[in-house]
């Protein structure tokens, strides 16, 4: 039974904590938890524990927070737990080859894409921005490469026209634990069937940046609408007006051709703020000026109509 496996869990954010909670709720034997060191957070920059640490301490589990797993003494922390398998979910630290080889069944990782598509740091956002019809989770055997290990189990879900990275995150946080628990059972039973990744199908999900989230009006309206959903809730797509950043929470595509230069404001009314793009028209529906809450286009026009005069161009 997989419940008899000695499991080390390594993870840091809420996404990882949901997987740890599922393991504990289903009776698995977690013998130790590794998570990143407490970090300064909030206005007061007070040291805050990770969601994984909070949960582990609530459950009375041993918690380890090394800055790195490269030093021999930190690797010994792993070895001393004599684990059968190490489960890694959004841990944030590199596992050296020596650590990968310590557990009897190796280390397995929950990755937020259908590998080999979207290896890397931002698979949820990249799949949405690219217009993929579906995404999912892959449970894989870890090796020294970046998300290059053999695939053990996959679960998929559709990407809808309303999905944001936030909603996809929640969907995958539900799928991941299901796939993880199934995989652990298969590993314990000896029924797991590792599948080598097809290198011809590999794409990379590079880390997001705030500058990348700045709206580029030369792109098509369809691309920009996906970008806005992909960058919600972080880092948020934004545009600049009078030197101020304005976040865009929601937009829609108007399939009408226009000869106006990209970035030109075409209309500004209660239906939204219509802006010409490289292909089609983007209708801005919900925006957030600096220091304010998100609001409808209509509410913003009531206070800042001078920002959106038809014929003017947005930078």
Swiss-Prot record:
Reaction(s) the record says it catalyses: L-methionyl-tRNA(fMet) + (6R)-10-formyltetrahydrofolate = N-formyl-L-methionyl-tRNA(fMet) + (6S)-5,6,7,8-tetrahydrofolate + H(+)
Broad class of enzyme this protein falls into: transferase
Record-listed (6S)-5,6,7,8-tetrahydrofolate binding positions: 113-116
Gene Ontology terms for molecular function: methionyl-tRNA formyltransferase activity
Pfam hit, one = Formyl_trans_N
The EC code for this enzyme is 2.1.2.9
GO cellular component labels:
cytosol
The entry's keywords: Protein biosynthesis, Transferase
| InterPro entries cross-referenced by the UniProt entry | Fmt (IPR005794), Formyl_trans_C (IPR005793), Formyl_trans_C_sf (IPR037022), Formyl_transf_N (IPR002376), Formyl_transf_N_sf (IPR036477), Formyl_transferase-like_C_sf (IPR011034), GART_AS (IPR001555), Met-tRNA-FMT_C (IPR044135)
Q: Which PANTHER family match?
A: METHIONYL-TRNA FORMYLTRANSFERASE (PTHR11138), METHIONYL-TRNA FORMYLTRANSFERASE, MITOCHONDRIAL (PTHR11138:SF5)
Summarize the protein's role. Answer: Attaches a formyl group to the free amino group of methionyl-tRNA(fMet). The formyl group appears to play a dual role in the initiator identity of N-formylmethionyl-tRNA by promoting its recognition by IF2 and preventing the misappropriation of this tRNA by the elongation apparatus.
Query: What does the sequence similarity comment in the record state about its family?
Result: Belongs to the Fmt family.
Q: What is this protein called?
A: Methionyl-tRNA formyltransferase
